[in-house]
Curated annotation (Swiss-Prot):
Domain of life: Bacteria
Annotated residues for binding of Mn(2+) 1: 249, 326, 328
Function: Presumably involved in the processing and regular turnover of intracellular proteins. Catalyzes the removal of unsubstituted N-terminal amino acids from various peptides.
Family, as annotated: Belongs to the peptidase M17 family.
PANTHER family, per database record: CYTOSOL AMINOPEPTIDASE, LEUCINE AMINOPEPTIDASE-RELATED
Family annotation (InterPro entries): Leucine_aapep/pepB, Macro_dom-like, Peptidase_M17_C, Peptidase_M17_leu_NH2_pept, Peptidase_M17_N
Originating gene: pepA
The protein's name: Probable cytosol aminopeptidase
GO cellular component: cytoplasm
Main subcellular location: cytoplasm
């Protein structure tokens, strides 16, 4: 176990860590008088003031035992919030390994959830395919007299974040649509939600032709994954979640360049996000009803691949001219959204998708784009992101963007003009939600880290966004 809470000091730890604010460093009671005196001298000599992300290490003889004592700075107490507390704890702990006794110098900072999350985040590594694996980890025992809840939300969600990251980091040769469906089924059994798998024949009967056209050339066949959590039998309100589930995307006949294909294992990041949200809702036993749909498939090339110029009839009866086979995600989402609205009859929908490169041009790698037909709902989703180290920004959804989707041969086309690409994609999706309240999250930047982000510093899957979705559902009065 990488994290636990303890109530008393022991001398068996490899390191002893104190997180302190810059107002005044208050040394822990477990240090004896002589150790405190020496520590105070070292602090003064090194002009250590516990500024944000500042760190000092010293060797002390405490109660006749040699210990390594480390103080990490959190900066000014009044400036601390959930986001920067995470960052400063991460900065202070990320290079520490072994068994650690951790404490805050101020009980007002006593935050089990954030600390547990950071520890699990530091320890994560997708090393499945390395011949030599990471053997040393950070194991934190948190010294607190606070009553510890049976389920520490931050810790449980951090472990689920690892599941999300594993799904996204897994190579596409392994994580094909069938494997994704199987893993969702196993997670349903583990966490406590029902899973129904619709094969290609069932999807055909439902008229999910836009989705199935994308999957046509792939060796691995498509599967629709339907997950249902019933946490409140008395409520008639159901939250709907949809995740883009492209387990690999070549771009189809509108073939991607090689460099763009290298990270396309992450094109099912939306699916992983929503599976993570389902696991979280079930694990924390929220008294809510939630249904999630993932239309999983691969976008490949082959003799029967769908083509630019093809006209498809979606599940809701609308016709679509294909102008670019690399704008496939919105085609799969179109039918998934129709399915969850018309068949599952949810009251509102949030979808998450690694949908457009345009959102990264607009917002960079670290911000999720938010699109909606309901301002109040979007505001609540954005507010929920403030609970986590995540950044959301609402994008425009003016009706004038609809002109960019006009086709000479069908009701609409799947791509518009180059400009405003992320909103064009969102306006396309809006055609498939009927009158249901809806928020679309474009996570093309935030699902995958290049290594430049100070918190998501490990290249690969970030495990972001599912926590925001979870918090939104948890805090919602419906």
């Amino acid at each position: 176990m990488s994290f636990q809470c303890v109530k008393k000091y022991e001398d068996s730890y490899d390191k002893y860590v104190l997180a302190a604010t810059s107002e005044k460093v208050v040394l822990p009671d477990y240090l004896d008088k002589e150790s405190k005196k020496i520590a105070e001298t070292i602090i003064k000599k090194n002009k250590f003031t516990a500024k944000a992300s500042e760190k000092i290490s010293m060797t002390l003889v405490n109660k006749k035992k040699v210990i390594e004592f480390i103080i990490i700075g959190l900066g000014e107490k009044k400036k601390l919030d959930a986001k920067n507390t995470r960052q400063y704890l991460f900065d202070g702990l990320k290079n520490i390994i072994g068994k650690v006794l951790f404490s805050f110098d101020n009980k007002d900072l006593d935050n089990i959830d954030i600390l547990a999350e950071v520890v699990e985040h530091i320890n994560y590594k997708f090393d499945k395919y390395f011949s030599k694996k990471k053997e040393e980890f950070l194991e934190v025992s948190y010294l607190t007299d606070k009553k510890v809840p049976k389920l520490i939300e931050g810790y449980e969600l951090a472990k689920i974040s690892n599941i999300v990251k594993d799904l996204v980091n897994e190579q596409a040769e392994v994580l094909n649509p069938k494997e994704l469906a199987d893993r969702a089924t196993k997670l349903g059994k583990k966490f406590g939600f029902d899973v129904e798998i619709l094969d290609e024949k069932k999807a055909q009967k439902l008229g999910m032709n836009a989705y199935l056209s994308v999957a046509r050339a792939a060796h691995h066949r498509p599967y629709v994954i339907v997950m249902r959590y019933k946490g409140n039998a008395k409520s008639k309100y159901t939250f709907g979640l949809v995740g883009k589930g492209l387990t690999y995307d070549t771009g189809g006949l509108s073939l991607k360049p090689t460099d763009s294909m290298l990270t396309m294992r992450c094109d099912m990041g939306g699916a992983a996000t929503m599976i993570g949200a389902m696991c979280s809702v079930a694990k924390m036993k929220l008294k809510k009803n939630v249904t999630c749909v993932v239309a999983a498939c691969e976008n490949s090339i082959g003799p029967n691949a769908y083509r630019p110029g093809d006209i498809l009839t979606a599940m809701n009866g609308k016709t679509i001219e294909v102008t670019n086979t690399d704008a496939e995600g919105r085609l799969t989402l179109a039918d998934a959204l129709t399915y969850i609205v018309r068949k599952e009859k949810v009251n509102e929908v949030i979808d998450a998708a690694t949908l457009t490169g345009a959102i990264m041009v607009a917002l960079g790698e670290d911000v999720t784009g938010v699109f909606t037909n309901d301002e109040k709902m979007a505001r609540k989703v954005i507010d929920a992101s403030e609970n986590w180290n995540e950044y959301f920004w609402q994008m425009p959804m003016f009706d004038l963007y609809k002109k960019n989707l006009k086709s000479s041969y069908a009701d609409m086309q799947n791509t518009g003009v180059r400009w405003g690409g992320s909103t064009n994609a969102a306006k396309f999706l809006e055609e498939f939600i009927d009158d249901t309240k809806w928020v679309h999250l474009d996570i093309a930047g935030t699902a995958w880290a290049s290594g430049a982000n100070p918190y998501y510093s490990q290249k690969g899957a970030t495990g972001q966004v599912f926590r925001t979705v979870y918090s939104y559902i948890k805090d919602n009065k419906n």
